[in-house]
Amino acid sequence: MITHAMEGSKTFNIPTFVLDENCNFIPDVLSRANAKFIKEVLIRDSYNAVCLANSFIPMATQTVEQILIIITKFKFSRSRDLLMSVFRLGVHINRFYAGKNQVKHMITMMKSLFDTEEAMRQLDRALMGLFVDARDNSYMPLIALSLHENGLPDSKFIKAVRLIQTTVNSFHNRPDADIEQYAEKLRAYNYLYKIPKYSLKEAVDIYSDNLKDLTIGVNKKPTLLFTSSDDAYLSHIYNDLLFLTSTWNMIYNCKKEIRRLNTWIKYEINSIMETAVLVGFQLPDLKETILDLAALISNMNLVSPDKELFPHYKLILAKLFEICIFATKANICILPSFIKGHLIEFEDVLKRSNDDEDLNYLLLKSRDSDDEYDEDKPPIQVDPGRVDNVLTDSDFFNVTPENAFSSIAIMPISYDKTIDVEDNEIQVLEVEMQSLSAVVYGAVASKYGLSLEQVIRKLNRNEGRTSSRASPSHSTSTVPYSPPQSDRSTPTSILRQRVPMRSNSRSSSVSFSQEDSNRSHYSDETNISDYSYPMADLELEDEEPMEDHPHSPQSTSSNNSMSRQSRALQNGQRRRAPTMVPSSQTRRQNNARPRRVARRLTEMMNDARL
């Protein structure tokens, strides 16, 4: 057993009943069938470690992680990445649920010690007998008023113990032999308990039983020395007061660990959501199950902090085990991080590519061909930027238009972009959140037949905001949309679905930036592409002052129909003009041609709209 190596140097035994057939899972947390699945997946030593970490013994979260060693059997190693995260989450949820009930029971039992008027008078007499000096007497109410669940954090506990130890001069205090080693038995059922310097082995035995009953949930009032007999000695009061302060400090630390664990659980769940979506790329049959999971996580994220979260945790955990069982039966190796890496690379290719380029070629191209092998030639170094075509190969992922996850836009994205949702087709999307990477909103939108734009606007409306529309272009001048931020985080970002833009002809085209931020492409049979110079790239040799320019921003509103490209046409015309200063008549002729071109372009735009 795991604990044999620890028993040699101890005077007590770690409880042997921390292992059970249900892996110490409470039936309200995990079903017996799912607990049996854990036992089937893990090797024996790992199963024992999970049972110990999953036991009722209160311990720090970092101690749980040291004990929790998850090792799957070889036949389940293909799904190891998914199984490890789900099993760890299950242990944390079980400890969270058990810990809350445990702390509630401890508080009830400890408060029952002095729930009557007679018991309170007995405590007052004991304290007055211990703190006999006038100087020490002022400490008595400071300690008595701190005996509750929120009264003794570590800092106050240390001060209280020091104050109690100052009373040893009021009686003959001679500790029993080897009392410190003997007192280690108090940690057998509670790893959060801090052991003060007791003086009586008799007291340690009683307090050990008290801690055991408090930990495992026995409905029995704790026993104290000065209340269990008519003859109350000062040494009894001294040890009892140390027990009271140390136990209330332990309860405070238990509550603190439960709060920490709750925060970690919420983060784990949202992180596993991303893993589940990546698994869905490899197992498209899980699409509906993952959408159900996304809806559950979305509901959890919207719960107020003062509400109970365990019902949400229970449903989410059951759905995750459903995914795990399906994944272990599939004849495929589950590699979420591998898939995410290729998705990021695929998106980077989309970001750099032009609309008329073949994505398959971009994903597979390299500077040299390594398809043919020649033993006389040295090995060819493949381009480091090359990636295998794992995303567009339908045989690898069995991705079809009917089951592709990209069609509902619930994957994370690696670049900051701006939001624009047009005709239910997502071109560019960004959602800024605080800490979690849940990808639930797009999934919920798809599940309930809503467009993602409707979901975003609904979220804005709930927070009293208006939705922000931005250009689908990659310009950095667009304003990003920031959804409502709260203590419950939501997706960092969501995958954009690149919508190819179609040109009206095969000839050269010019892109026009309209005031409504929609992009259109128009072609001209004439050599219009000669005039399409970006304005920022021009080096004008004969630039007129801005205030005198007929198309400057300070001109009248009648000139606002001129787009930036039309102004670039005029600048390009001047660039090809001689460097010598032309006459006024020549200048008017040169200025007339760009205006004619601009009018023609405006007419073409109006015709295209009609």
Curated annotation (Swiss-Prot):
Residues 600-610 have a biased composition (Basic and acidic residues). Phosphorylated. Residues 484-495, 581-592 have a biased composition (Polar residues). It is found in: Virion tegument; Host cytoplasm. Residues 467-478, 503-515, 552-567 have a biased composition (Low complexity). GO terms for cellular component: host cell cytoplasm; viral tegument. Keywords: Host cytoplasm, Phosphoprotein, Virion, Virion tegument. Residues 462-530, 543-610 are annotated as: Disordered. Belongs to the herpesviridae pp85 family. This is Phosphoprotein 85.
